[in-house]
Amino acid sequence: LGHSMGGMIVQEMTKLAGDKVEKLICYGTGPRGNMPERFETIDQSRDRLKIEGLTNTAHRIAKTWFVKEDKAKHFDLCSKAGKLATLEAADFALVAMKNWDGLENLKNIKNKTLIIWGNKDRAYNRNQVDTLNEKITDSNLIIFEGCSHNVHLENSDKFNKTVRDFLL
């Protein structure tokens, strides 16, 4: 199970050891780290991180993960978690995302796969998740209406039921 950058990581893990993965869950993610139509480019995020600092960047980006932005119930959880990183680690994470491309590997993923996406996601657009769904042969896309990037926090009951039903 992987969310956002974690979704890239689980795709890579499946590439390296797919025979050890029974089922794969990718949510709020796509096949490319350098996300087209993201709320801002990765380079813009890196530049703003250097200028605005970690605290402001974590707050600003976490707002994009929720439909209700900083008024969302679990916004503070995400904003505070982002502020626990170092400036260097945050920049390295952005570079890693920018440079990762798993598109060519999707045809090799044979594992039963659940793809979850919030239709208000500003990081990963519909094309990204449609590509996952089309290129992974045994996949199913579930769209959460009225949710953004953090569907697991915006509609946790439905998210947990969806994951549980897929795993059982």
Q: Can you describe what each PLM-predicted range is?
A:
Residues 122-128:
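Conserved alpha/beta-hydrolase "acid-adjacent" motif
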Residues 139-168:
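Catalytic active-site module of serine/aspartate enzymes centered on a nucleophile-bearing elbow/loop
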Residues 2, 6, 10:
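Gly/Ala-rich beta-loop-alpha elbow adjacent to hydrolase catalytic centers
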Residues 109, 115-117, 121:
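Short beta-strand/loop motif that positions the catalytic acidic residue
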Residues 11-16, 20-52, 56:
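Flexible "cap/lid" loop of the alpha/beta hydrolase fold
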Residues 1-2, 27:
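Short beta-strand immediately N-terminal to the catalytic nucleophile in serine-hydrolase-like folds
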Residues 130-139:
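Active-site-adjacent alpha-helix of alpha/beta-hydrolase-fold enzymes
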Residues 34-40, 51-108:
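Conserved alpha/beta-hydrolase catalytic His-Asp/Glu region
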